[in-house]
Each structure stands twice: as C-alpha cells, then as structure tokens.
C-alpha cells in the first residue's frame, strides 16, 4: 500500500478549480468510519486503519479539511468519535457540510460537498493509502 494523492485534474481532464467552482484553497475529504477508518462491523469498534489515519493527519497538517461521514448516530457515533480521538484524529465536521460550504451555497444540502470521498463501499481505502 502506498500513500498517494488523487490527481483529480488527470481524471477529469480539466483544472480542478474551474471544475469545482469552489473558492477554497484546500481540499475537503469525507471519510466513512466502519470498514474504512476502523476495521469493524457496526456497532463494534475494531482495529484502526493506521495508514489511512496517517494519510488524513498529513492532509490536515497540509491545511485540508476532513469530514467524518458515517451512518452512526447516538451512542454508536459517540463511541466512534472517542475512538478517533484515541487515534489522534479529529474532524472539521461530523455528518455535516463545512460551515463555509453552507454559507457559499446558502443551504445545507443532504449531499456532502467534498473533493474526495473515502468509503469501503465507494473508494477502497487502499486506493488512497
């Protein structure tokens, strides 16, 4: 496994700033919990995906924003957040768009606005790290 960054310009064949039309100077990365950050089956907590966690920490250190986007709610979400703190991972938003995105569009869409979405049912963690 390698830690890489996705070349969105190469994939879409255009300048990412023109494609997204977002005035952000950073990437927004949304990540799932179960099977992605944590190798577990809901509602249990399991082994951390340390390579992905290190990748996300490096992205935050570079100024990018991280959103936890999970189906967990209530106590299961609280347990997952505590687990993430134990791993040294914190989020800019949890199951929500960033405030600056809500302000930009004038509403809070149910669809998450992000540049990269990492989910075991969408993009395998191995594809980015």
Regions found by a protein language model. Name each.
Residues 3-129:
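HAD-like aspartate-dependent phosphatase fold
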């Amino acid at each position: 496994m390698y830690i890489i960054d996705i070349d969105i310009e190469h994939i879409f064949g255009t300048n990412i700033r023109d494609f997204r039309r977002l005035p952000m100077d950073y990437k927004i990365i949304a990540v799932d919990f179960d099977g992605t950050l944590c190798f577990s089956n809901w509602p249990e907590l399991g082994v951390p995906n340390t390579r992905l966690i290190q990748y996300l920490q490096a992205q935050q250190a570079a100024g990018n924003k991280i959103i936890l986007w999970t189906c967990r709610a209530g106590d299961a979400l609280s347990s997952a957040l505590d687990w993430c703190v134990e791993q040294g991972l914190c989020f800019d938003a949890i199951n929500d768009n960033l405030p600056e995105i809500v302000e930009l569009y004038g509403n809070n869409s149910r669809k998450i606005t992000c540049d990269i979405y990492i989910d075991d049912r969408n993009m395998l963690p191995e594809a980015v790290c």
